[in-house]
């Protein structure tokens, strides 16, 4: 429990005296403080709704220590009904997106972790395959479709980002992870048109102009687009698909030779080649990954075959969460977890290994 408010507010010197609510607010989606035990149930319900509705995020609930054993709190609990309701996109937004897609000569789909969080995997796969467009998964969207899928353009990432003319962002933000949609990575300025699906309207136009914004949850957006795509004439040109496949095949052949180098001492490529084979042989394994070079190279080398089976440092790039994430994944799923840690990142969380050993977790 947090420190007692009447002592903290007068700075009287309580044990671990700290205004935890004020400290949590800048870093959480929402932060609330309880004053009465009878409000525990409604406060927990509000925290759940805040955490998983709209764009999901962490919520801090400040509960003073005096309330932790209050019997009244248990009696106050409420059932949280539909905490994350669907957000249906406007028909005009879907129609506009189809018109933009019709103009595409070199289309690309970018899958983000928002699409993974939505857990509408079948709809996403249906839309990607029905469109025929090459797709590029961001790191925690890997596995929504297997990295071995014939439409996956991850091995031709530089080419498709630079040369595409219409880019469909599915639950992916155009932030630092994508160079804010600008610079050499994206080719000539103004040469691209973006279709963006996002549950938050404020995300649109955050870095570049969005030609067709679609506000809604990814599942509902996919359903609406799938219906509108029938007979719309949006098939990608064969020349574009052949060029992407040719580049991806050539890059994979070059990389494969480096992964089989068998150097002594072992280098990044040799180590990640072994890990890649292990994941391919055991695709149900959850991969946790953090670091700098370790993160970048592992993301591009190791295939992920199932949704939400890769956990990394996310948008903020915070180091030191890897082993904690591995523990959570093992406990929540019961699956085997493989943690690939950079040396510096492991330095922040290495003592978590003691917890792994104490509970004999499959990590």
Model-identified regions with their sequence ranges:
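N-terminal alpha/beta PP-like core and its mobile active-site loop of ThDP/TPP-dependent enzymes
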Residues: 1-236, 278, 336-338, 355, ...
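A general structural motif
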Residues: 9-14, 84-96, 266-267, 290-294, ...
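Internal, active-site/partner-interface "lid" segment
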Residues: 40, 235-252
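Short coil/turn segments at secondary-structure boundaries
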Residues: 60-62, 238-243, 288-291
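Short hydrophobic beta-strand segments
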Residues: 108-112, 286-289, 343
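Conserved short loop/turn motifs at secondary-structure junctions
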Residues: 112-116, 260-261, 265, 342-344
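Active-site diphosphate/adenylate-binding microenvironment
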Residues: 246-332
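Catalytic phosphate/nucleotide-handling subdomain of diverse soluble enzymes
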Residues: 321, 325-361
């Amino acid at each position: 429990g947090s420190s007692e408010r009447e002592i903290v507010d007068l700075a009287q010197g309580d044990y671990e005296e700290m205004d935890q609510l004020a400290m949590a607010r800048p870093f959480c989606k929402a932060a609330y403080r309880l004053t009465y035990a009878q409000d525990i149930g409604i406060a927990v319900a509000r925290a759940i709704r805040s955490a998983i509705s709209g764009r999901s995020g962490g919520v801090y609930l400040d509960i003073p220590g005096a309330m932790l054993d209050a019997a009244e709190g248990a009696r106050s609990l409420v059932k949280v009904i539909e905490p994350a309701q669907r957000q249906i996109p406007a028909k005009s937004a879907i129609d506009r997106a189809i018109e933009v897609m019709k103009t595409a000569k070199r289309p690309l789909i970018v899958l983000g972790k928002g699409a993974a969080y939505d857990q509408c995997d079948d709809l996403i796969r249906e839309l990607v395959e029905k469109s025929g467009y090459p797709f590029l998964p961001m790191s925690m969207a890997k596995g929504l479709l297997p990295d071995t899928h014939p439409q996956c353009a991850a091995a031709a990432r530089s080419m498709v980002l630079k040369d595409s003319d219409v880019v469909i962002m599915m639950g992916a933000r155009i932030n630092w992870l994508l160079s804010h949609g600008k610079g050499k990575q994206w080719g000539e300025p103004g040469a691209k048109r973006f279709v963006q699906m996002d549950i938050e309207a404020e995300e649109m136009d955050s870095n570049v102009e969005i030609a067709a914004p679609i506000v809604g949850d990814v599942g509902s957006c996919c359903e609406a687009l799938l219906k509108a795509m029938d007979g719309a004439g949006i098939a990608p040109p064969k020349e574009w698909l052949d060029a992407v496949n040719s580049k991806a095949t050539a890059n994979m052949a070059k990389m494969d030779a480096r992964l089989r180098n068998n150097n002594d001492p072992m280098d990044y490529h040799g180590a990640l080649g072994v890990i890649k084979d292990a994941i391919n042989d055991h695709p149900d394994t959850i991969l946790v990954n953090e670091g700098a070079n370790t993160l970048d190279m592992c993301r591009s080398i190791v295939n992920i075959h199932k949704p939400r089976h890769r956990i990394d440092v996310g948008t903020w790039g915070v180091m030191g969460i890897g082993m904690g994430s591995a523990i959570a994944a093992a406990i929540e799923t019961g699956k085997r977890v493989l943690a690939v840690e950079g040396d510096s990142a492991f330095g922040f969380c290495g003592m978590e290994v003691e917890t792994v050993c104490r509970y004999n977790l499959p990590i």
